[in-house]
Every structure is written in C-alpha cells, then in structure tokens.
C-alpha cells in the first residue's frame, strides 16, 4: 500500500464509544463524543479512557499491532478474515471453594490479564503481590485501572499513522521508521520467574556474585561455589530492597538477567505506574511505558497528543504544539499572535476566558479582564480600581489600605462593619 493510500485511510474512529457515560463527570457529560482532532470528549473534555467505553477488542488489536514484526509474535494471533493481528492476552480464572452452612459453593475470580506462565501458582503469587486496587479482576477497580493504563501508556497514535490527524506522506514514512526502530531496540515484555530458577541457569546469564567463570581445580571447590549460589542475596533493581527466593520476580530481557524487580516495582521511571501487561521500553538503564519512551525521543503536541514528526512546530508554556494545533481549548481558534490565558495548563483565547473562566468583580459584578489588575482575597476578587475596591459601607477607596473582609464584603473600619451588621 503506497503512502497516499495510507493517508487517505486515516481516521480517528469518531463512532467508537459514542455516547458512553463519563466515569469522572457522571451526569454532567452528555456522553462521549470524540473531538475532531483532539483525543478528548467534545462534551466534557475528558479523555476516552475516562469514559465507560467497551474497548477490549480494540485494545487487543492495538497491542497485537505493537507486537507484529517482533520476537513477541507468539503473543498474537491473526484473524482469518482480514489478517489483523490480535493480542492473545492470558486470562486467568481461579476457583476457590467457599464453606457455607449446608454445602460448599465455588467462588470464581477472573483476571482479565495474567502473566503468560505455565505455573498458575506462580501467576497467582504474582497477582497477590500487586496492590489490591491494581489487580485486574473482572469488574473491579483494578480492571478499570488496567484499561486506563492501556490507553494512557500505549496510545494507538504512537504506533499507527492511520490513528493520527492529517499526516503528510513524509510524516507517515518517518513515523513508520520510528516505530520500526523502537520495536527492534527498546520494546520488551517482562518475564515472571523465581530468582532461583534464573540463578540455576548459571553465571553467564545472571552475572551475580559468586559467578566465577574459571574452571575449579577440585570437586570441593565446585561444592563451595554451589553453596555460595544458595546464599545469593537478591535485591530489586527499583527499590533496592531484598527479595525472597520463593517470591516471583520480573525480568526484562533488554535490561539483562542480572536485574530483577518486585511485581509492584515494575513501573515506568517517569509516571511510576505499573507497566501494563508488563510491556516495557528500555532506554539508558531505565524502564519506560510506551508513552514516556516516545516522549523521550520525540516532541509531543499538547493539543492533539500525537508525536510531532514535522520539522516545524511551536513551543509555548513549556509545551510543544503542531502549528495548526496551538488553538483555544474552548473554541479551537488559532492563537498565533493572539492574547491567550492558560487555564489548567490549557491555552484559552481572551473572549473565551472572559465568557467562561474569568472571575467576577465583587464591586461591579462584571467579569475581570485578564489584562486588568485585580485584588483577590480568599475566593473573592475586585477590579483594582477606585470604582470597585471600596468599603461596603462608606464607599471609601481601599487600594493600599487595611481592610476587614466579611463574606464577600470589605470594610475600612470596625465602625463601618457594625453599621452593616
């Protein structure tokens, strides 16, 4: 497929999740409606991950595409109908007998994802070592956490040009090369094992104390080495605390098998969130999630959340922006050369600020222009003028004077306060 056809096929999937309720805004949001180029809801401005959107198949396609053309193809299966790679995530179902008064019932727990190991007891141990609120039990807070992290850590628009907004053929080609590079140099999936299992494979892989590669002179020397291996102290690469031999540890092949992590410590070095499904990116002796690895390699547009592959972009408020995406967060008007105000780290044009965000003067009850000086006390504001910042009793100007605030009113003296009480 040539680049022109790829560009034509691009689309952000605006029908996906349409009308889904917002888990954060509740009834304040009319339902999810994707903005035409931002990755947020047009109604409430929250991301798709904050909405109750059923995405299991879509997320499996996304992760499947991530693993395509890598050594992790065993984790994907291609659909016969269209050849789309699908992530074969490991689902674990545990059954526990529960004693009742008359008979024994079975309590079933389904994990929406579990480490793909043959030893189910090891997988179960791994889950128990995660914080309860992050265990991906179906229908739980942990399952919602996993869903949110899949969206946040592995954005589809960081690997698939068709999920991006109006890329040029040159940008598509550059993005494809970037994705190919990180798949071959940084992408990995954690491996759950017992520390002693890796130790048994020998010092050539583990590079641990006691790993003398010289040939022993006698059988007694070999026995000493064996005893030394048994006394090996394992410590977590993240928290540096010791690990128990019988507890599962996570290894990352790209980091080398001399490093291991507690299950709860296998986190992104930037956002410190659990690496979802143990999918990691390794760079400069650090673990990253997909998002923050890409951020370390390319600028990201604060408007559309996509990586910037264009040579021309703008920087404002310590953030990067596509030239066409440095827009008002409320009305999408372009802000180049215009006055704007930052509201919750988002740029807003002056008219929208006055209309939607400006504080109201307690004196004249009009919105306070962002360029005008004001006086603020607690949650109350006034124009810093002789017409507005006045004693609520005698109308004396209080600019530069001591005053007594009382529930939105200000007084120049105790006497004036008493007259109004």
Swiss-Prot record:
PROSITE patterns: LIM_DOMAIN_1, LIM_DOMAIN_2, PET. Its main location: cytoplasm. SMART domains: LIM. Ubiquitous. It is found in: Cytoplasm; Cell junction, Focal adhesion. Signal peptide: none annotated. The keyword Magnesium does not apply. Keywords: Cell junction, Cytoplasm, LIM domain, Metal-binding, Repeat, Zinc. Residues 234-297, 299-359, 362-421 form the LIM zinc-binding domain. GO terms for molecular function: cadherin binding; RNA binding; zinc ion binding. Pfam families: LIM, PET. Changing residue 391 to A: Abolishes localization at focal adhesions. Residues 155-164 have a biased composition (Basic and acidic residues). Residues 92-199 form the PET domain. One of its GO terms (biological process) is negative regulation of cell population proliferation. InterPro entries: LIM1_Testin, LIM2_Testin, LIM3_Testin, PET_domain, PET_testin, Pk/Esn/Tes, Znf_LIM. Residues 133-164 are annotated as: Disordered. GO terms for cellular component: cell junction; cytosol; focal adhesion; nucleus; plasma membrane; protein-containing complex. It comes from the Eukaryota. Scaffold protein that may play a role in cell adhesion, cell spreading and in the reorganization of the actin cytoskeleton. Plays a role in the regulation of cell proliferation. May act as a tumor suppressor. Inhibits tumor cell growth. Interacts via LIM domain 1 with ZYX. Interacts (via LIM domain 3) with ENAH and VASP. Interacts with ALKBH4, talin, actin, alpha-actinin, GRIP1 and PXN. Interacts (via LIM domain 2) with ACTL7A (via N-terminus). Heterodimer with ACTL7A; the heterodimer interacts with ENAH to form a heterotrimer. PANTHER family: LIM DOMAIN-CONTAINING PROTEIN (PTHR24211), TESTIN (PTHR24211:SF1). Belongs to the prickle / espinas / testin family. The N-terminal and the C-terminal halves of the protein can associate with each other, thereby hindering interactions with ZYX. This is Testin. It comes from Homo sapiens. The gene is TES.
């Amino acid at each position: 497929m040539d680049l022109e056809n790829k560009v034509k096929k691009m689309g952000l999937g605006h029908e996906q999740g349409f009308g889904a309720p917002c888990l954060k805004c509740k009834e304040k949001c009319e339902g999810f409606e994707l903005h035409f180029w931002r990755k947020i809801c047009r109604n409430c401005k929250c991301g798709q991950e904050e909405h109750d959107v059923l995405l299991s198949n879509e997320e499996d396609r996304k992760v499947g595409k991530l693993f395509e053309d890598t050594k992790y193809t065993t984790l994907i299966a291609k659909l016969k109908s269209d050849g789309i790679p699908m992530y074969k995530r490991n689902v674990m179902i545990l059954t526990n007998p529960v004693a009742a008064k008359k008979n024994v019932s079975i309590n079933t727990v389904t994990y929406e994802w579990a480490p793909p190991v043959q030893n189910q007891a090891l997988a179960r141990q791994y889950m128990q070592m995660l914080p309860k609120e992050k265990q991906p039990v179906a229908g739980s807070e942990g399952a919602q956490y996993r869903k949110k992290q899949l969206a946040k850590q592995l954005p589809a628009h960081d690997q698939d040009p068709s999920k991006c907004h109006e890329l040029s053929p040159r940008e598509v080609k550059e993005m494809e090369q970037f994705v190919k590079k990180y798949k071959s140099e940084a992408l990995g999936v954690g491996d759950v094992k017992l520390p002693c299992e890796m130790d048994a494979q020998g010092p050539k892989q583990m590079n641990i104390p006691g790993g003398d590669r010289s040939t022993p002179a006698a059988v007694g020397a070999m026995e000493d080495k064996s005893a030394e291996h048994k006394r090996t102290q394992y410590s977590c690469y993240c928290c540096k605390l010791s690990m128990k031999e019988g507890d599962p540890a996570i290894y990352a092949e790209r980091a080398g098998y001399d490093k291991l992590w507690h299950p709860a410590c296998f986190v992104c070095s930037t956002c410190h969130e659990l690496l979802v499904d143990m999918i990691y990116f390794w760079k400069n002796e650090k673990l990253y999630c997909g998002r923050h690895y890409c951020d370390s390699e390319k600028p990201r547009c604060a408007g559309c959340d996509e990586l910037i592959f264009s040579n021309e972009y703008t920087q404002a408020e310590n953030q990067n922006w596509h030239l066409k995406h440095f827009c008002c967060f409320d009305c999408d008007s372009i802000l180049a050369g215009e006055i704007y105000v930052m509201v919750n780290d988002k740029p807003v044009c002056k008219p929208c600020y006055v209309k939607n965000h400006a504080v109201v003067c307690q004196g004249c009850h009009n919105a306070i222009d962002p360029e005008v000086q004001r006086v603020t006390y607690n949650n109350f504001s006034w124009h810093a003028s002789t017409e507005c910042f006045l004693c609520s009793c005698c109308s004396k100007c209080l600019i530069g004077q001591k005053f007594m605030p009382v529930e939105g009113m200000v007084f120049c003296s105790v006497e004036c306060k008493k007259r109004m009480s």
